[in-house]
């Protein structure tokens, strides 16, 4: 297991040699060796010794903090990779024509992946064939516009937004009406599907942040997503390539009945819908099983991007 989710209010985490140990009411309640760990996700209010954080960082383990409602709270990584030249070149290219060229490729690939998933949906739900065909036609036009029309990053954002709206209209139709998912709503999510999309996009984002930092890039310097204080803009860029993978995973969670309405709760104050503790226990192992197949793809994409920044054939090392 390369990722561990810690989601117990009564737990205390301590260092025990080259392991982390869990204590409940002063008594040891299990331990994990550090050697296989790459990520620790801490949910809610967990008591953790500073020495544990030191140990995790020194072993190159990323610590992601989420609130009890599974919203992002913070991330702890080790120091940046020593290859400062890569980050210098990244910054230089962010100010050049490379930004627009990369952004066009990025959004074209995203829309192609949306179109291809709509083709799958067409086969999954025969009743949606006509609607899917219309959506596919619109997405094909968007792809053509990116390829042949002189375009700016601002106009590219308009194309991307319109394509995503069309895509989600059809995507929403493959879920049962009982889930009340009709469109993408982010803050707060208003139904179980939106809740899972938001959670999985968040986890994906910080998986990509980790890969970016491991290779030596600066996650805050993006190309399609321009620099914004406090935002990992490069991660926002690269996440676009994999959103459809998340959409497919979320669909499978509900299709296979791993999750249902019973696993979610509504916050009366905000109106948001969130995964309950029982649902989280089901989700964590399913996510880890799915993500094992995805990480090699994500890592390859980040490595390929680093090669483009360096304009070298071989990946950096050391």
From Swiss-Prot:
Positions contributing to Mn(2+) binding: 160, 225, 240
Keyword Oxidoreductase set for record: no
InterPro entries per UniProt: Cas1, CRISPR-assoc_Cas1, CRISPR-assoc_Cas1_C, CRISPR-assoc_Cas1_N
Protein origin, superkingdom: Bacteria
Cofactor: Mg(2+); Mn(2+)
GO biological process: CRISPR-cas system; defense response to virus; maintenance of CRISPR repeat elements
Coiled-coil ranges (or none): none
Keywords from the UniProt entry: Antiviral defense, DNA-binding, Endonuclease, Hydrolase, Magnesium, Manganese, Metal-binding, Nuclease
Statement: the UniProt record of this protein carries the keyword Nuclease: yes
MF term (GO), any: DNA binding
Pfam families, A to Z: Cas_Cas1
Record-listed E.C. numbers: 3.1.-.-
Uppermost EC category: hydrolase
HAMAP family referenced in this protein's UniProt entry, alphabetically: Cas1
Role according to the record: CRISPR (clustered regularly interspaced short palindromic repeat), is an adaptive immune system that provides protection against mobile genetic elements (viruses, transposable elements and conjugative plasmids). CRISPR clusters contain spacers, sequences complementary to antecedent mobile elements, and target invading nucleic acids. CRISPR clusters are transcribed and processed into CRISPR RNA (crRNA). Acts as a dsDNA endonuclease. Involved in the integration of spacer DNA into the CRISPR cassette.
Subunit structure: Homodimer, forms a heterotetramer with a Cas2 homodimer.
Similarity comment text for this entry: Belongs to the CRISPR-associated endonuclease Cas1 family.
Record's protein name: CRISPR-associated endonuclease Cas1 1
Organism the protein comes from: Thermodesulfovibrio yellowstonii (strain ATCC 51303 / DSM 11347 / YP87)
